């Protein structure tokens, strides 16, 4: 009896996605300074003269 291909064990085409994409750059260019400044502003609120 021949092997049935109704439930393949391995995908035929496996895509390898790049890590650094335009979306990744956009998210990090906007996100990293935003988190930094939010942390800096929060720290400034806690300073008592």
Swiss-Prot record:
Cite the binding residues for heme.
Answer: 28
Q: Where in the cell is it found?
A: Cellular thylakoid membrane
Family annotation (SUPFAM superfamilies): Cytochrome b559 subunits (SSF161045)
Q: Which GO terms describe its biological process?
A: photosynthetic electron transport chain
Q: Does the keyword Membrane apply?
A: yes
What is the cofactor note? With its partner (PsbE) binds heme. PSII binds additional chlorophylls, carotenoids and specific lipids.
Q: Name one Pfam family in it.
A: Cytochrom_B559
Write the record's keywords in alphabetical order, separated by commas.
Electron transport, Heme, Iron, Membrane, Metal-binding, Photosynthesis, Photosystem II, Thylakoid, Transmembrane, Transmembrane helix, Transport
Judging by the UniProt lineage, the source's domain of life is Bacteria
Q: Where are the transmembrane segments?
A: 24-40
Q: Which GO terms describe its molecular function?
A: electron transfer activity; heme binding; iron ion binding
Transmembrane is among the record's keywords:
yes
The record's GO CC annotations read: photosystem II reaction center; plasma membrane-derived thylakoid membrane
Q: What membrane topology is given? A: Single-pass membrane protein
Cofactor(s) this protein requires: heme b
Tell me which family the UniProt entry assigns to this protein.
Answer: Belongs to the PsbE/PsbF family.
Q: What does this protein do?
A: This b-type cytochrome is tightly associated with the reaction center of photosystem II (PSII). PSII is a light-driven water:plastoquinone oxidoreductase that uses light energy to abstract electrons from H(2)O, generating O(2) and a proton gradient subsequently used for ATP formation. It consists of a core antenna complex that captures photons, and an electron transfer chain that converts photonic excitation into a charge separation.
HAMAP family with a match to the protein in the record: PSII_PsbF (MF_00643)
| Record text on subunit structure and interactions | Heterodimer of an alpha subunit and a beta subunit. PSII is composed of 1 copy each of membrane proteins PsbA, PsbB, PsbC, PsbD, PsbE, PsbF, PsbH, PsbI, PsbJ, PsbK, PsbL, PsbM, PsbT, PsbX, PsbY, Psb30/Ycf12, peripheral proteins PsbO, CyanoQ (PsbQ), PsbU, PsbV and a large number of cofactors. It forms dimeric complexes.
Q: What is this protein called?
A: Cytochrome b559 subunit beta
Q: Which organism is it from?
A: Prochlorococcus marinus (strain MIT 9313)
